Amino acid sequence: MAKRGNKKKQEAPLSLGKHTVGGRVGKPTNAKTGSALTSDKSLFDKRIVKQLKNNELFNRLTLPSQELRDGIVRENQTKPSNSNSQSNGAISIRGIAGPTNVVIENLAPGTSSDDVAATLLNFGEILNCQVNDSQGKVRASVRFSTLASAQQVVQKLDGVTADGFKLSCYIKKNSKKRRTQKK
């Protein structure tokens, strides 16, 4: 006789456009607990990968960067990278360590903050995710714990077509002005 308390919960499916992918939504955890995905190779079964092999957003999220550079995924547009080094060899250190906001514009109507967070979970720790729908324009603001995670999202998702809409992604500059005390 099976015990009722030991049944595993059925995980909610994740949708990428008209395709549905099974998986857990949330932060990855220890493999011993079995409460989250354990490796990149086990994220999707072969049937799902075969169905989504021509989906540009899925490919950008799952293919290694080298394959993207080699042209397996066709780039919609080429933009200069937001690197921290300038042409004269100088680097920028300010702003590297803190949390960074990414704005994703032109999302499909009906997209929720949970949808966005689940899609971007592979890029890094998400501190906050909000979706605003203003007059039919859906826009997400996602706060990542590191600048590197935010830059990776912009690099992979800017210009990608998702759910029939071409996404626009950029890093939001911090507009807070710091006050200096005069003595």
Swiss-Prot record:
MF-aspect GO terms: mRNA binding
Coiled coil region boundaries: none
One family name in Pfam for this protein: RRM_1
Main location class: nucleus
UniProt keyword list: Nucleus, RNA-binding
Single GO cellular component term: nucleolus
InterPro entries recorded: Nucleotide-bd_a/b_plait_sf (IPR012677), RBD_domain_sf (IPR035979), RRM_dom (IPR000504)
Localization per record: Nucleus, Nucleolus
Region (Disordered) location: 1-36
Domain RRM: 100-174
Name of the featured protein: Uncharacterized RNA-binding protein C126.11c
Organism: Schizosaccharomyces pombe (strain 972 / ATCC 24843)
